[in-house]
């Protein structure tokens, strides 16, 4: 509960009891207040116990090729996007290290825009990049943002997520990475400016301009809207790397109109049509983003463009098995903890990939497919000591048969079948 001065009704520090007139600052928290003197005392205690943290530096920045090689361990395909990201991130942190030493040339910030369909790996690339560099990372959804003063989330709340990711170490957060997803959803409805207020489209783009370029932002520590009696966290966004991503559905048509070429094989040849659309996507330019509905000032603060392609069946199968944190490996490990071996046949993996393509969910849908199929297995195995091995076949994925349970006595059990000798 808040503490009040009974005579004057003033707010008081919840720790030492001093009123706001007796201290220089009174910082508001969720239901409590703390004065600057108590903050200083707490800070001294923490520093004595933990020691002063070293200044955040990036002296040993991985080279672009090293970054790409690490990304290969976690993300399948998308080599073009990996190269663009690796170079941009390397240059960004090299620029931070240069600091103010280059008096003759000012090194500009290189924020990144990623264009690619749902489930192509945009979020995973950004997450992996932050893990490679060991920097704070935050994800935001552009569709939840609105212009200040309207119902929704202020853009400053994105910065709060980054500060929270850095355990409220502002200096560390100032060198972090923010990924804003669904950026295409805040495109204005037409290329021409509207006379009506677009609070979740162009208004949000305008609000994002300053933090993308670099400014000292005031962030409410409790989140939500700014209100009186609230002390703000000051954070400099100059060295924060912003990566924005979106599907930009239909941008191929914008590119096609610009280059004046038709999509070849649009008829029945699905493969040619998709390959040609991906080729068009690879040719996307900043002017195409403007035609799509992003304002020129916003595009200008995203100088690096990386395009991702739709994942085919082969790539989805590799995603299931090859990365260090591959889904199949995770489930194999999960059953291994119950002393049971799990095996997916090659045909089963292909069926999972086909189902993800059919659902148009890309790599993002792989986990939900396996979760659905593994539910009965994960429910049954812990309660049975006689199961030695579980085999998932293509018929398991298509629903024609259940998983095969190889028992410790050598027999095989399958849903709907009688026991048979292995």
Curated annotation (Swiss-Prot):
GO terms for biological process: cell division; proteolysis involved in protein catabolic process. GO terms for cellular component: HslUV protease complex. ATP binds at residues 117-124. It comes from the Bacteria. InterPro entries: AAA+_ATPase, ATP-dep_Clp_protease_ClpX, ATPase_AAA_core, Clp_ATPase_C, Clp_protease_ATP-bd_su_ClpX, ClpX_bact, P-loop_NTPase, Znf_CppX_C4. CDD domains: RecA-like_ClpX. Zn(2+) binds at residues 13, 16, 35, 38. Keywords: ATP-binding, Chaperone, Metal-binding, Nucleotide-binding, Zinc. Residues 1-54 form the ClpX-type ZB domain. One of its GO terms (molecular function) is ATP-dependent protein folding chaperone. Component of the ClpX-ClpP complex. Forms a hexameric ring that, in the presence of ATP, binds to fourteen ClpP subunits assembled into a disk-like structure with a central cavity, resembling the structure of eukaryotic proteasomes. Belongs to the ClpX chaperone family. HAMAP family: ClpX. ATP-dependent specificity component of the Clp protease. It directs the protease to specific substrates. Can perform chaperone functions in the absence of ClpP. This is ATP-dependent Clp protease ATP-binding subunit ClpX.
